[in-house]
Amino acid sequence: DTTRQLAYVYSEIGEITRSAAEREKLAAAAEDPDVARDELLTAGDLYNQTGALAEAARVYEEYVGKYPEPVDINMDTRLRIADIHKELANDTKYYEQLEAMVAVANEAGDDDNDRIRLLAANAALALAERRYDEFAQLQLTQPFERSLPLKQDGMDRAIAALEGIVNYEVAEVTAAATYYIAETYMNFSQSLLESERPVRMTQTELNSYELLIEEEAYPFEDQAIAVHEANYEFMLTGVYNEWIQKSLDELAALLPARYAKQENSEGLLRSVDTYTYQAAGATEAPALTLVETAPISDEYREAFDKALAQLDQGEQQPSIDNLAFLTSESPMVAASHINLGIAQHQAGNLEAAEEHLQNALALGVAARHPVVLTELGIVFRKLGRFAQAKDSYEAALSAVPEYHFARRNLGILCDLYLADTDCAMREYETYSAAMPDDEEVAIWIADVSNRMAR
């Protein structure tokens, strides 16, 4: 009882390390194994909380050694040990703990569950990434008789490790493994093309050698493309994450006519109180004019212009801070919300971007603002919320049918992310009729037409 009281008192007065030590004593003295297990784990967590990492690792290691069950808690604790060793740059112990996690999961039997598979899959991925890194660092140098077998063996080991991850049936980790398999093939292809050439060859011999290397290398590039495309098609089953986007980015570089299709937007509002959209080639009145109804002082206008100038000069965070202040000072001025949302988007803060753009839409003057709706469509796409992205683009076009930014982006969404070629062709052709000088979209139309014909 005294020990328990001390543990409580030390915790209350902020002496967390001393509280952890008392928890260890409670664990050692407890007759009930459940109490002992809980106290020991609590002690480790308290050490970890205070940054006493060596002590935390020691207690956690005692825990996993004494208490193999429940398996999921054992696995979670092993992850904490691994994280500590990673933070301490102790790679050997870090990878040892990951290997232990995989082994524990493989022996889980009836105790297996989604949490255990997730932890094991991520551990296996980290181990496979090490295999990939080791393989990628191998250079093909002369004599080939020595370096080529090492490179091939490294490739085989990396692919075997990555393919084993699929068995865990964890969607995000499967996508990561598939991405790395494709990159393994691509690295082997590039390594062949960039390999050291033999010396003392005539120009004719060298030309023949170059052709031979290319014949060997390009099939591996084709394999890389096929695997990246398989990962991309995984998205069409409803899975979307950073690894699928990474595969799509690689495909954009390898097959640009098919995959290099990037959304764009009108960008920042240049005026705090007036927005005008003039359709391309139009000579009559603007297609849309929006005028702010909230009062705007000269000081507010000056602060808005300052934040805009900061963004133009690449001073992202100061501008975000200033725009956040403006939205709190005058929450009814739509332009500040809009530019704050765009700035957060540019900074990669997608959730914050969505929040501020939605705030703008809630204001009467911006309820159907095409800039907001189009920017929000891009944000939704990046968040994997494709149906909402489509709704947002269509809302922009409902407000202003001539708004070419939304039209182009809707075509890309249908093409790359919804696999709806009819929609893609319709939007691309409508866009191209209004923007005939965009040669890139003309190429996309030809690409979609070819795929529809097949």
Model-found features: residue ranges?
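Canonical tetratricopeptide repeat
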Residues: 5, 39-42, 80, 180, ...
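Alpha-helical segment of the N-proximal tetratricopeptide repeat
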Residues: 137, 145, 293-329
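Position-specific recognition of the canonical hydrophobic site in helix A of tetratricopeptide repeat
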Residues: 11, 48, 86, 311, ...
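Residue-level recognition of tetratricopeptide repeat
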Residues: 8, 45, 70, 83, 129, 172, 299, 333, ...
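TPR alpha-solenoid repeat register
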Residues: 2, 36-39, 73, 175, ...
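Alpha-helical adaptor scaffolds
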Residues: 335-400, 405
